[in-house]
């Protein structure tokens, strides 16, 4: 047994828990890291039969920990599925029933020459219904969330600063989270003295348009920025207080965009250009040539992030008392040129 106990659950869920967590001799509350990715099919991972995409870290979690083969998402779309996890409610009883966005009625503002809404986000979680971070906080945990929120629009009754999250960095709005080179991200940090959830402008990105060839000149890649914030938060944990980390990484949904590094290059050499994507300006999805290589690269990049989280826990000496859980919010998507049938990403009902 590895020092962590990993659990993977169906639609791709996996977890690892340390031996100390299972020991009656120790009353120490375990640390918990829940990594929830976005729109990954269970068939995207090698441990669930994927043959073309490299996922060594998640495959190792499955081998050394617990692999689930029967599990169900709360909903086929993002916000209500995440609400089911946060509230413990069936989506038929929960307050959040869909991906309803509030920004269409909001005034607009400019970031460079790019237009954005002054308010973005989804239906708020019911403030009278306790959610998972609040439960953890009441039980003595410090809490950090990095990635997608989708539990309330900016300035609403349900934003990270109002729901017992000590540190947040990522996207308030699930629609904004479809883009990897955004105009802004959101942050709430008690350590930085924030009193509310704020916007953090991507100063380099806003010099270039959201749609067209110049979009590729943007360099502030949100997936990496969010991951680095998560690692920095984890690096601050010293074992004196139990921690709950909710890493809601946006990979592999939705636009097929990422740095043209060794991960992507390896898949460009592996896959022919047999399917392209023309783009959709209304959705702000740009044209993609290497659709299959781009998607495969996003899965391997996510796997690399998971491996770095596990390595950080070991480096800090926290792996002996930490549970790590990995899952997806729901099944695969087709937006932005994704091709779930090509990779056999899920089964058909």
Residues covered by each model-derived region:
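Bacterial N-terminal signal peptides that target proteins for export
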Residues: 1-11, 18-19
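Conserved beta-strand->loop/alpha-helix structural units within folded catalytic cores of enzymes
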Residues: 37-39, 135, 139, 146-148, ...
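Active-site segment of extracytoplasmic enzymes that catalyze sulfate/phosphate-ester chemistry
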Residues: 23-24, 42-131, 135-141, 155, ...
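A structural signal for short, well-ordered beta-strand segments and their strand-loop junctions
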Residues: 144-146, 246
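Active-site-proximal cap/lid insertion segments
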Residues: 27-30, 37-53, 60, 67-69, ...
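Bacterial Sec-dependent signal peptides at the C-terminal "C-region" and cleavage site
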Residues: 15-28
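Short, structured coil segments at secondary-structure junctions
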Residues: 161-164, 345
